[in-house]
């Protein structure tokens, strides 16, 4: 596992341990690796707690030490059973609240349901609902990393520190890709162009954007929004007044804006979940002359058959951080590499507990990062 160690953080962390308790809210032992790394860096023991499933599938949490008047940090990494993971977190937060903890800080590197942060047809903004549930349960502060949309911070009425993994990924590129100077940073869609531009400017590299093969817009005829007005109201509508309709989208021919011929292509994004779009992008880049293809992302969900598809694809290497456990996927696909980000989470915990400024962790970060 690749681990970045900035010189400023190499010294032993100076932390007041008396009023700090560190819990892992995961009942799944495979999800506790990140918690153990953070505890080791801070030089503290993990708090004593039992999180398990009853025979009737209910979640039970039993805190086995006093948290009265203490700063409680609850680390929750998201497992494949995301809904159970959320309940584990909410129940533990509420248990700490009713046990008179001074503050309850959630350390959730990957915020679940972050893709559902926009209203779509008759759906709902689920990430707003989840934020409200966490605050209601008793969370007083949130530490997370690379939210899918930065505006999600506004869903909370508590402080949110949205840390960035890009410094770790940038250093991986510089140290693990020997000829990275001959690389070009690629956005697999115009939506991820800002992130790609940020990487390209920091590495002094060129940028390419893949455009085309857009999905068809959802039909309003399907969900009933194109329904005609009720018969009673038809007579009230003047014949000359007709509401203009939005022109439907069409798939444009796929285009790569930028030169990738004879270059290393580094595709950057925040989440790798369904890999179909990454595979299509890799094939396109190969056709345009790229001789090596890397994919870099913060969160490696790698759902379903993602490891097998990556192994059989034109992608040479997929680099993700350990915000989400993916050891099983790495066994299935040797192309998957991991960057450890426990250092920045540990430093955030230390600074919050000691009442220090967090601005150090956001140096040189712009609005588009």
UniProtKB/Swiss-Prot annotation:
The modification N-acetylmethionine is found at residue 1. The modification Phosphoserine is found at residues 219, 227, 233. GO terms for molecular function: identical protein binding; magnesium ion binding. CDD domains: PRTases_typeI. InterPro entries: Pribosyltran_N, PRibTrfase_dom, PRTase-like, Rib-P_diPkinase. Belongs to the ribose-phosphate pyrophosphokinase family. Binds to PRPS1 and PRPS2. This is Phosphoribosyl pyrophosphate synthase-associated protein 2.
């Amino acid at each position: 596992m690749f681990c970045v160690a900035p010189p400023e953080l190499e010294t032993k962390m100076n932390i007041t341990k008396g009023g700090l308790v560190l819990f892992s809210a995961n009942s799944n032992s495979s999800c506790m690796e990140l918690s153990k790394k953070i505890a080791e860096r801070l030089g503290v023991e993990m708090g004593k707690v039992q999180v398990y499933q009853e025979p009737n599938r209910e979640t039970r949490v039993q805190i086995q030490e006093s948290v009265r008047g203490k700063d409680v940090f609850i680390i929750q990494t998201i497992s494949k059973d995301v809904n159970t993971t959320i309940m584990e977190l909410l129940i533990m937060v509420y248990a700490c609240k009713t046990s008179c903890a001074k503050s309850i800080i959630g350390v959730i590197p990957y915020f679940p349901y972050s893709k559902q942060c926009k209203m779509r047809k008759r759906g709902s903004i689920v990430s707003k609902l989840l934020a409200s549930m966490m605050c209601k349960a008793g969370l007083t502060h949130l530490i997370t990393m690379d939210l899918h949309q930065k505006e999600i911070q506004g869903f909370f009425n508590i402080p949110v520190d949205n840390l960035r993994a890009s410094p770790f990924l940038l250093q991986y590129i510089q140290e693990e890709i020997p000829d990275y100077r001959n690389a070009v940073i690629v956005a697999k869609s115009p939506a991820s162009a800002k992130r790609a531009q940020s990487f390209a400017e920091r590495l002094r590299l060129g940028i390419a954007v893949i455009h085309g093969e857009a999905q068809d817009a959802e039909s309003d005829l399907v969900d009933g929004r194109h329904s005609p007005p009720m018969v009673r109201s038809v007579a009230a509508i003047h014949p000359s007044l007709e509401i203009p309709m939005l022109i439907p989208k069409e798939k444009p021919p796929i285009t790569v804006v930028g030169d990738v011929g004879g270059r290393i292509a580094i595709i950057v994004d925040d989440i790798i979940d369904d890999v179909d779009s990454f595979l299509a992008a890799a094939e396109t880049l190969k056709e345009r002359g790229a001789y090596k293809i890397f994919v870099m992302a913060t969160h490696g969900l790698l759902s379903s058959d993602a490891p097998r598809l990556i192994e059989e694809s034109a992608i040479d290497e997929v680099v993700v951080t350990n915000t989400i456990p993916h050891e099983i996927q790495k066994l299935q696909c040797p192309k998957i590499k991991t960057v450890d980000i426990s250092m920045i989470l540990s430093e955030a915990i230390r600074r919050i507990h000691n009442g220090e400024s967090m601005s150090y962790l956001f140096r040189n970060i712009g609005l588009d990062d």
